[in-house]
């Protein structure tokens, strides 16, 4: 069996063209299908909502941070695909003792392209992966380069958590023309006083993981009257697979 190196610099022995794949990451599930691998995908998480209806046809092996190891064992996977941030490492450590586990570690669009290329290599779909990367690259090239203004992007309500540097969302915010005012890396907690002091032009409330709604817009708008507060599609800012094809069109449609 050939050896491959994943994005955590782990060398994995993976069979040529694996036939029983489990995806532990929603964006990668969609990517695998778009690479033509739906028939070889046997297991996914309860959060793998795209493509619609796929969960009814496949085995749900739990969530991204709680795996049902008995269900995984019953599927007899010859490849499991995960992510450093989205999956819990204790579970990954147990899985990699029994199965080939390929992990991604993504902070930028370039990392996402490397991941797509890597999955193409380990699944025998390199040509399809290259076409997808080319399509996304071409689309991104037409993204307006103008600055929209300063922004804070929230992913959680209580405690209030924002997106900082060293995250994929931070990279995509910059590509969308936003200047992220949050300087602390990863996902720092903020207070309302912090938000008022930052005084962003835009307060972006993500649809996931916390499901911000119109009532939250109203709450923040009352506290930050000079800031334009709006809901944004978290999938379009945080999913780093084939959904990137829709990023430019979505961003250009934002108010």
Where in the sequence are the language-model features?
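N-terminal ligand-binding lobe of clamshell/alpha-beta domains
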Residues: 1-255
């Amino acid at each position: 069996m050939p050896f491959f190196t994943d994005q955590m610099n782990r060398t994995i022995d993976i069979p040529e063209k694996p036939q029983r794949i489990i995806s532990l990451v929603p964006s990668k599930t969609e990517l695998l299908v778009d690479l033509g691998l739906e028939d070889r995908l046997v297991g996914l998480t309860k959060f793998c909502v795209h493509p619609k209806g796929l969960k009814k046809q496949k085995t749900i092996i739990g969530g991204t941070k709680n795996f049902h190891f008995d269900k995984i064992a019953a599927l007899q996977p010859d490849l499991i695909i995960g992510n450093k941030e989205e999956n819990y490492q204790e579970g990954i450590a147990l899985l990699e003792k029994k199965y080939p586990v390929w992990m991604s570690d993504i902070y930028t669009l370039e990392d996402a392209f490397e991941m797509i290329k890597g999955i193409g290599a380990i699944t025998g779909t390199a040509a399809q992966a290259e076409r997808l990367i080319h399509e996304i690259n071409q689309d991104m090239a037409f993204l307006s380069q103008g600055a929209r203004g300063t922004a804070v992007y929230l992913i959680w309500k209580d405690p209030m958590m924002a997106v900082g540097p060293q995250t994929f969302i931070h990279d995509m915010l910059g590509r969308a023309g936003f200047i992220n005012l949050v300087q602390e890396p990863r996902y720092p907690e903020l207070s309302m006083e912090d938000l008022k002091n930052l005084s962003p032009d835009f307060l972006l409330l993500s649809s996931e993981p916390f499901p911000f709604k119109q009532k939250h817009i109203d709450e923040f708008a009352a506290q930050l009257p000079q800031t334009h507060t709006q809901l944004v599609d978290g999938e379009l800012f945080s999913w780093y697979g084939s959904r990137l094809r829709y990023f430019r069109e979505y961003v250009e449609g934002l108010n």
